[in-house]
């Protein structure tokens, strides 16, 4: 990997601000806010046991935030859902790639201390925004292979951009 440019770091800060505002409106408490040196960390205090169900819940939360906020330039890191991930030691240098004027090594730092503990109900609520595969039901005659979204959008002249990840496809109108 390489260090982020000043422009990329600024884009990460802007995205972090959007996510912060969204989660605050959603009911989340104030997080610890930090700059990793290459991006932004929003660390929410939650009291969850270290078990498979809670790991899945956190993974879905990050997938939801990725779906809602990631762009071509800035991505939500979806890999930090398990308790065994090592957290940045703030106050140390972020040494990624070569230290160049365009992509300098920076010192990570805490920008704001956290507010309170975020209740699990807000994590669960956030996960409801993640699309679920619809199951065929007798009442809805759902047959996924019969509907082609791209063909339908093209037929009606609706412009879109398609963003694909390993987990889903997002159509931005």
What are these regions (language model features)?
Residues 1-38, 45-67, 132-149, 158-161:
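Signature for HUH/AEP ssDNA processing cores
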Residues 101-146:
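Long, charge-rich alpha-helical interaction segments
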């Amino acid at each position: 990997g390489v260090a982020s440019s000043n422009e990329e770091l600024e884009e990460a800060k802007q995205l972090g601000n959007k996510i912060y505002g969204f989660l605050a409106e959603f009911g989340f408490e104030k997080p610890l806010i930090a700059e990793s040196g290459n991006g932004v960390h929003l660390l929410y205090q939650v009291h969850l046991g270290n078990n498979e169900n809670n790991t899945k819940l956190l993974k879905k939360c990050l997938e939801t935030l990725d779906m809602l906020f990631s762009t071509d330039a800035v991505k939500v890191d979806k890999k930090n859902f398990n308790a065994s991930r090592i957290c940045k030691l703030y106050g140390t240098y972020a040494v990624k790639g070569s230290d160049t004027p365009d992509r300098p090594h920076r010192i990570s730092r805490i920008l704001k201390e956290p507010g309170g503990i975020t209740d699990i109900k807000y994590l669960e609520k956030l996960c409801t925004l993640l699309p679920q595969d619809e199951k065929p039901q007798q009442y809805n005659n759902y047959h996924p292979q019969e509907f082609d979204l791209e063909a339908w959008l093209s037929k009606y002249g609706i412009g879109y951009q398609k963003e694909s990840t390993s987990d889903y496809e997002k159509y931005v109108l």
